[in-house]
Design a protein with these regions (language model features):
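Short, intrinsically disordered, charge-biased short linear motifs at domain edges
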Residues: 22-29, 80-94, 142-149
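Membrane-interface junctions of multi-pass transporters
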Residues: 33, 61-108
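Preference for well-ordered, secondary-structure-rich cores of eukaryotic proteins
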Residues: 50-55, 61, 106-119, 140, ...
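Radical SAM enzyme [4Fe-4S]-AdoMet core and its adjacent flexible, acidic
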Residues: 1-58, 62-71, 119-121, 170, ...
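Recognition helices and adjacent regulatory flanks at domain boundaries
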Residues: 111-145, 154-156, 177
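Core AdoMet radical
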Residues: 143-153, 164-209, 222-239, 251-274, ...
Length: 522
């Protein structure tokens, strides 16, 4: 097979984007394999910067590593070109598998298609395949997909988060100390026991050399960017978020897709300031597209348990507010975890309703405008299409797999939870996947379904029902034992009650208690 991406035939949508279908995925897998078994375009084109802590990783799966200040002082481009990253790139180009990318290797070793393949098919990656294969790995390069957190200022303390990304977590750990699990055993673990909370993040009052370097580097990086995404903390609590918006208004990149994560639970005054800024950016036509991401992984009080500080009804209201605005997309981002299992179906029902209500069927709109025939088309969809010219889809869904902290990983759930909740949830979603030219995008996209499917299938293969010894395997027993201690400590600190909030998981809670007592020898 040719090593050239541009010489190959790819099945594309009508808008020119490459489809994430089985044929294209297999073709990309083979194309990457021509360079090496661990070759991944995301390592060369995607970066997430945690400027509050001075950490970076490429892509989002590997554990973040520190950006050495001595490297940064010599060259601000070290934000994306640390010696660590250059070494990993060289390994990929020389046919090796970097150890930090173990998530993808696990999926592939189980016979699946990992994010390495899916990400490499994205236009911000695939368009650069041919030039990347000519590199040695030691070059200073620019990303095409930049995600940045300016600090940990946040008004929430999600259960799966921590002090690196939440100032509320910092305050809780200062007040109560680290969360200890399986205490007194040889597998005792502590959540952020050895972290210097005073030095973990640069405060607003301190000079932050990483943010200083960012604003030196960003003007040079901007022309190379296809995606710029701001995350947190809570981005709306950072002045650099609003500085970014103003910078983009004054320095257009009309090939750029700009997006911001927000918990949508900030005070009204701050929310209104954000809405004003984002509407001015849209009216300036300085960027190609704008997307607002909001995180929620379950429904109602279960979602609020997982994300302490979340106002679920306010989030629902503000999601619809964004969906009704001109030419701005809203995407629900659900970091799938153990707390998602029993109410994710209700979340999907809501997202499906939003898609039905707000997503214009661009294919039928074009057909209507050309022929005058209204083929199964609501007239409101024509209006939505006209006021959203930059977006084929107004309401989207992303389902990343939460791997850390490990004791909140869904792979520790029981067979009953898998069979009674996850399989039916997957079936619900599969029945509403729309992949035809006729109905797109009134249902779930294939790529949205695939993300949930990979998570559920990973759980099924991790702990197979016909392998009885797996249910009592050391790793599973330890993870469940840790989970028991974790939720009990969260309940004590936050005045919550896991079993009252998740009565359908009471049996799982007891299984975790038994695992905990087994390890502790009770």
């Amino acid at each position: 097979m040719s090593k050239s991406f541009n010489d190959m035939e790819w099945e594309r949508y009508t808008n020119g984007l490459i489809q994430h279908n089985s044929q294209n995925l297999e073709q990309m897998k083979q194309l990457l394999g021509n360079t090496g078994c661990g070759f991944c375009l995301a390592k060369f084109r995607q970066v997430t910067l945690h400027l509050g802590t001075g950490m970076t990783h490429s892509c989002h799966h590997p554990t973040p590593h520190k950006i050495p200040l001595d490297e940064l002082e010599k060259n601000p481009a070290a934000l994306f070109n640390t010696k660590h990253l250059k070494r990993a790139r060289s390994e990929m180009l020389n046919g090796d598998r970097p150890s930090e990318c173990d998530y993808c290797w696990r999926v592939e070793d189980e016979g699946g298609l990992s994010d390495r393949i899916f990400k490499s098919l994205e236009p911000w990656a695939s368009d650069y395949h041919d030039e990347i294969t000519e590199l040695t790995g030691d070059e200073n390069i620019f990303p095409s997909y930049l995600e940045v957190s300016f600090g940990n200022a946040c008004n929430m303390k999600c259960t799966y988060c921590g002090p690196e990304f939440s100032s509320q977590w910092v305050e809780e750990l200062k007040a109560h100390g680290p969360v200890r699990m399986l205490e007194g055993t040889d597998v005792e673990t502590s959540f952020h026991d050895n972290v210097d909370l005073e030095k973990l993040n640069y405060t607003k009052r301190e000079h932050n050399p990483y943010i200083e370097a960012f604003w030196k580097w960003f003007p040079k990086a901007l022309p190379h960017l296809k995606h710029y995404r701001i995350t947190g903390g809570e981005p709306l609590m950072s002045k650099d978020t609003f500085k970014s918006i103003e910078w983009l208004i004054e320095n257009p990149n009309r090939d750029l897709e700009f997006s911001i994560n927000t918990n949508m639970s900030v005070p009204d005054k701050l929310w209104d300031k954000f809405i004003d800024a984002i509407q001015r950016l849209e009216k300036s036509k300085s960027v190609k597209r704008i997307t607002i991401y909001s995180s929620v992984e379950g429904w109602g009080e279960r979602a609020e348990y997982a994300r302490t500080g979340l106002d679920f009804e306010l989030l629902r209201k503000r999601v619809e507010q964004i969906a009704q605005m001109d030419n701005i997309r809203v995407n629900i981002m659900a970091a799938f975890n153990i707390f998602s299992v029993t109410s994710f179906d209700k979340l999907l029902e809501w997202v499906y309703e939003l898609k039905q209500k707000y997503n214009p069927n661009s294919n039928l709109v074009r057909f209507y405008k050309k022929t005058g025939f209204q083929a199964n088309l609501n007239k409101d969809f024509v209006a939505y299409s006209d006021k959203n010219p930059s977006h084929e889809i107004i309401v989207g869904l992303d389902i990343p797999y939460l791997r850390h902290p490990e004791y909140l990983d869904v792979h520790f759930c029981t067979h009953d939870l898998l069979e009674n909740y996850l399989f039916p949830t997957l079936a619900y979603m599969s029945e509403r996947v729309v992949n035809s030219e006729w109905n797109t995008p009134s249902g779930f996209e294939g790529i949205e379904f695939d993300k949930l499917k990979r998570i559920v299938m990973h759980r099924a293969h991790y702990n197979k029902k016909n392998h009885n010894d797996r249910e009592t395997h050391t790793d599973i027993t330890r993870g469940r034992g840790q989970f028991y201690d974790f939720v009990n400590e969260m309940d004590r600190r936050r005045g919550t009650n896991f079993v009252d909030t998740f009565p359908e998981m009471a049996e799982f809670y007891e299984i975790c208690r038994e695992a905990n007592e087994t390890i502790k020898g009770k």
